[in-house]
């Protein structure tokens, strides 16, 4: 059940779709920055890292710095986890005996295996594609610089679906395997990877409940790549633009446009929880989310009658990668929704790399949502991740 719930959540948050060329946008995507000395560099000032490399929005990890070591704590590796995962990162020259018995990782990472495509946008921003040796589910990758390396063999595919190609992973000889867990012993990969004596790290970014919190996991990745300065500068531009945009939406006077989210999956209608990522995005964009009172951080299952009763008056419907036209054929009653009758339906279907550069650039996701809910605020912004998808008669 946990696996199913997470897959439903990711369907909405990370609508994996076909990448298209980006249209001109009034809101910029984050850009890479020049390389700077890392913590392990002898010329670096350790005090900078202790002051500026700690998360401020992300709740799932923390870091502390020692003498040529970093201690990284993943506070919640999966929803409801009763344990933290602590990793000791060691710079060159530190004796392994000093960290015996600990989950230790030698840094900077040179050969990384990524078992989720959601890290690709941040890897590209850090210009770390050359350090990526393998990726699971390569057919889902949308980041162009990674796709090019997959195509010419510089990055290897590590299997598709829930399984990982263990033999290929071992042959890869990675110095870091980054993956996620759900607390399900039948599907979690990290125990088996640990038994192979490969350094494996759990990334809990998917549990963050705010767009800025999730984007700040670029810092987590940077700890292993020893690129905290670059990550901090990149995230600073993301944060500044996100806060500027949310301030614009917050300043709008009068009633907020009502918005509903989610779509049916089988016989059940799944809507984003009011306290989760999408609920926060709707709120920051100046919308009144009709299911804000569903105080969950993951998607919530509802009967269609409940959705029909509360969702029908909503002015805007922003869904995942579902096909609105197909939904109308399967469930004709949605044609009674106000959003359907006015054509104010937006989806992420066949639009862009929502799950990669979208999560790394929440300021653009926010701009898209503001453009939909308050078009007068961003008249020159062209939608990057959403598209208007009216249902025809």
Locate predicted features.
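Positively charged n-region of N-terminal signal peptides that target proteins for export
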Residues: 1-6
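Bacterial N-terminal signal peptides
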Residues: 7-17
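Cleavable N-terminal signal peptides
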Residues: 10, 21-24
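N-terminal ligand-binding lobe of clamshell/alpha-beta domains
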Residues: 23-393
């Amino acid at each position: 059940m946990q696996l199913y719930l997470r897959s439903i959540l990711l369907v909405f948050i990370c609508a994996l779709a076909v990448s298209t060329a980006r249209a001109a946008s009034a809101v910029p995507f984050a850009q890479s920055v020049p390389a700077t000395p890392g913590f392990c560099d002898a010329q670096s000032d350790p005090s900078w890292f202790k002051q500026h490399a700690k998360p401020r929005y992300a709740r799932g990890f923390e870091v502390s710095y020692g003498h040529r070591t970093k201690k990284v704590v993943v506070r919640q590796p999966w929803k409801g986890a009763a344990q933290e995962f602590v990793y000791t990162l060691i710079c060159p020259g530190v004796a392994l005996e000093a960290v015996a018995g600990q989950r230790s990782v030698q840094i900077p990472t040179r050969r990384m295996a990524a078992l989720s495509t959601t890290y690709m946008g941040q890897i590209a921003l850090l210009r770390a594609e050359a350090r990526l040796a393998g990726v699971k589910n390569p057919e889902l990758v949308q980041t162009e610089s990674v796709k090019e390396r997959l195509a010419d063999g510089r990055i290897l595919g590590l299997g598709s679906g829930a399984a990982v190609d263990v033999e290929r992973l071992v042959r890869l000889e990675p110095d870091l395997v980054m993956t996620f867990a759900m607390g399900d012993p039948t599907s979690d990969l990290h125990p088996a990877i640990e038994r192979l004596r490969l350094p494996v790290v759990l990334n809990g970014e998917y549990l963050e409940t705010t767009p800025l919190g999730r984007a700040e996991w670029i810092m987590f990745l940077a700890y292993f790549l020893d690129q905290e300065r670059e990550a901090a500068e990149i995230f600073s531009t993301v944060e500044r633009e996100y806060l500027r945009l949310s301030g614009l939406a917050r300043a709008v006077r009068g009633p907020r446009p009502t918005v509903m989210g989610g779509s049916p999956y089988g016989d059940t209608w799944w809507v984003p929880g009011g306290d989760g990522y999408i609920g926060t995005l709707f709120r920051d964009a100046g919308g009144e989310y009709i299911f804000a009172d569903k105080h969950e951080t993951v998607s919530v299952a509802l009967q269609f009658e409940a959705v029909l009763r509360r969702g029908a008056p909503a002015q805007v419907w922003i869904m995942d990668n579902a096909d609105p036209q197909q939904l109308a054929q399967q469930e004709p009653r949605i044609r009674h929704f106000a959003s359907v009758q006015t054509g104010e339906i937006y989806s992420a279907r066949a639009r862009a790399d929502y799950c990669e550069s979208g999560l790394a650039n929440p300021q653009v996701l926010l701009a898209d949502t503001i453009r939909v809910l308050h078009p007068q605020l961003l008249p020159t912004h062209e939608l990057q991740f959403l598209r208007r998808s009216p249902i025809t008669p």
